[in-house]
């Protein structure tokens, strides 16, 4: 939630998230192809699968909430996109890494600068602290800070 609108929306929808037993993965407000997009990524708590009915119910509640708030937190035209973060969900915040570790799945990590000769690694999170993670790969252990990670996603194998 890199901006003020996303932070405000996150705060506004928190009661809806809690009432519907959901997990707020991320909120972003960006410009895409000339159009403003408010994107809200939600999931079920406890590693359960979210359904389209869950997303539809939440979307209706968010629409009703945003239509009644004065002053309007987003006075310009925008598209509302509410969805699951997906199986290959982005790992953005430190708690996302905790979630990924608990899932037992591998993650894919791309670094800004190569680690041990490679910019991309796949493995399981062994440890997490407030500064970074320890990633166990098939061949070695990589220790890194969150600041060194360019992008990380869950690597769910079906």
Curated annotation (Swiss-Prot):
It is found in: Cytoplasm. It holds the Pfam family RimP_N. GO terms for cellular component: cytosol. Its main location: cytoplasm. Keywords: Cytoplasm, Ribosome biogenesis. The keyword Cytoplasm applies. Belongs to the RimP family. HAMAP family: RimP. This is Ribosome maturation factor RimP. It comes from Leuconostoc citreum (strain KM20).
């Amino acid at each position: 939630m890199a901006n003020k609108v996303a932070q405000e929306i996150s705060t506004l929808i928190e009661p809806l998230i809690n009432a519907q037993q959901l997990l707020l993965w991320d909120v972003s407000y960006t410009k895409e192809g000339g159009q403003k997009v408010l994107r809200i990524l939600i999931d079920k708590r406890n590693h359960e699968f979210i359904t389209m009915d869950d997303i539809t119910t939440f979307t209706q509640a968010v629409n009703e909430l945003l239509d009644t708030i004065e002053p309007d937190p987003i006075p310009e035209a925008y598209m509302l996109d509410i969805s699951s973060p997906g199986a290959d969900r982005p790992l953005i915040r430190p708690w996302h890494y905790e979630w990924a570790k608990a899932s037992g799945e591998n993650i894919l990590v791309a670094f800004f600068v190569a680690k041990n000769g490679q910019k991309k690694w796949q493995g399981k999170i062994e440890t997490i602290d407030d500064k970074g993670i320890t990633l166990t790969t098939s061949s070695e252990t990589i220790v890194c800070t969150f600041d060194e990670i360019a992008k990380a996603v869950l690597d769910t194998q079906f």
